[in-house]
Amino acid sequence: MASEQEKTADFGFRTVAKDEKEVMVAEVFHSVAAKYDLMNDLMSFGIHRIWKRFTIECSGVRRNQRVLDLAGGTGDLTAKFSRMVGEGGEVILADINASMLKVGREKLRNKGIIDNINYVQANAEALPFPDDFFDCITISFGLRNVTDKNKALRSMYRVLKPGGRLLVLEFSKPVIKQLSTIYDAYSFHILPRIGEAVASDAGSYRYLAESIRMHPDQETLKGMMSDAGFDSVNYFNLTGGIVALHRGFKF
């Protein structure tokens, strides 16, 4: 029988049943989907665009390749990858949340980005793709919301081609003490107020702050990726470690 720890997961600072967490996370993103892009700009002062640009630069994606933008949400990375892979390539924007997927699809279609993109509602823990299928997988600000992160990493490894790479862009642990103090004050006191003012939803942004604190730190996530099978795993601290980009390869 599974232990109690195996049956539960963190939802922010709370411990809940795993199936309950999936429902609760879904409710958060159904709530914030319409204001997601605006809130990203406000919360990060636009810096999220620099973090994502760095992820693109580290991806090594080339023409005619197949890319999975997992937890791709409103499609920022998908839009860039679509141009990089060209007509002979393919980008799959996958997200477990139907509301986020809908916003992403409408956003990209309104920009005329259509031809080489497919949309799939998928759970990162059980990806509905063949083995050795993608040249590159990215998951941007999504892994911390996954219930079983180790299972998801193994699933990503399975569908990645030999020679392919995974990039995980995620909030992490600041490496400068003074920055950490300021960041905590901002996250727990200011961020929920912005969420209430802009999206009428302080609770979802309180969960965001808590989920960041519960997410594995840089070295722990590096070890988790290695345990899932990835080789040459390394990471880059961005903005003093507020965000980290982890990269691993499948050889």
From Swiss-Prot:
EC number: 2.1.1.163, 2.1.1.201
GO biological process assignments: aerobic respiration; menaquinone biosynthetic process; methylation
Reaction(s) catalysed (UniProt annotation): a 2-demethylmenaquinol + S-adenosyl-L-methionine = a menaquinol + S-adenosyl-L-homocysteine + H(+); a 2-methoxy-6-(all-trans-polyprenyl)benzene-1,4-diol + S-adenosyl-L-methionine = a 5-methoxy-2-methyl-3-(all-trans-polyprenyl)benzene-1,4-diol + S-adenosyl-L-homocysteine + H(+)
Classification via CDD domains: AdoMet_MTases
Binding site for S-adenosyl-L-methionine: 74, 95, 123-124, 140
Keyword line: Menaquinone biosynthesis, Methyltransferase, S-adenosyl-L-methionine, Transferase, Ubiquinone biosynthesis
InterPro entries: SAM-dependent_MTases_sf, UbiE/COQ5_MeTrFase, UbiE/COQ5_MeTrFase_CS
Stored Gene3D superfamilies: Vaccinia Virus protein VP39
Pfam families found in the cross-reference section: Ubie_methyltran
Pathway: Quinol/quinone metabolism; menaquinone biosynthesis; menaquinol from 1,4-dihydroxy-2-naphthoate: step 2/2; Cofactor biosynthesis; ubiquinone biosynthesis
Signal sequence interval, chain numbering: none
Molecular function terms, GO-annotated: 2-methoxy-6-polyprenyl-1,4-benzoquinol methyltransferase activity; demethylmenaquinone methyltransferase activity
Domain of life, per lineage: Bacteria
HAMAP family: MenG_UbiE_methyltr
Role according to the record: Methyltransferase required for the conversion of demethylmenaquinol (DMKH2) to menaquinol (MKH2) and the conversion of 2-polyprenyl-6-methoxy-1,4-benzoquinol (DDMQH2) to 2-polyprenyl-3-methyl-6-methoxy-1,4-benzoquinol (DMQH2).
Family statement: Belongs to the class I-like SAM-binding methyltransferase superfamily. MenG/UbiE family.
Protein's recorded name: Ubiquinone/menaquinone biosynthesis C-methyltransferase UbiE
Protein species of origin: Pectobacterium atrosepticum (strain SCRI 1043 / ATCC BAA-672) (Erwinia carotovora subsp. atroseptica)
Lineage: Bacteria, Pseudomonadati, Pseudomonadota, Gammaproteobacteria, Enterobacterales
